[in-house]
Amino acid sequence: MADTANLEIGDQKYSLNLIKGTEQELAVDISKLRKESRVITFDDGYGNTGSCESEITFIDGDKGILRYRGYDIAELAEKSNFLESAYLLLNGNLPSGGELDGFRQRVAGYCDLPAEVLTSIRSQPAGAHPMAVLSSGLQALGGSYPQYGTNDRKKDLESFDESSALIISAVRSLAAAIYKNSLGEDLSSSDPGRTYCENFLSMMFDKPGESTPVPSAVESALD
């Protein structure tokens, strides 16, 4: 098979490279087309356009395929858990026992939200849309950790492990805080000794000062 596609516009011919994806599907690389021809392509809604090359995920909605780093999502749902899958997406491989323990500890270290972030959430009306409040909460979180968003690419890449752990952990706490705020209740304290999903469920449904056991079946289903 040829590794180029030929395009004719009027009496002009253009040779465009072909890119083969992980599932052997082909794409036409038009990145140089405008420069060479001053012609652009039109794809309403970008339903037929790939935005980037990715080693992280593969999605084919028509066929019901979703893969993370080559692993079928159904296999991960059955044999893995949330933090293992998050580690896979971030690092390209499933973690060893020691790597998972270290990742779990790093994530647990950011479970408690800064006071100013909680204040931001409490300032929102109880009936506000959760996604709008989550967006404002993440913005407030960025203000609490300026060292992770310096706009210095080198520095930000060096702190990527910490900033990713922060977001993974804080989104869970933000979701629980938003739910509690909608009920007019305070957020329950986190427990670093609990698992990721166990902590989330506890923060969602415990009253402040309570520590109710989370049913293992519910935790497992969420994880």
Would you name each region that the model predicts?
Residues 2-223:
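Hydrophobic alpha-helical bundle cores within soluble ligand-binding/oligomerization subdomains
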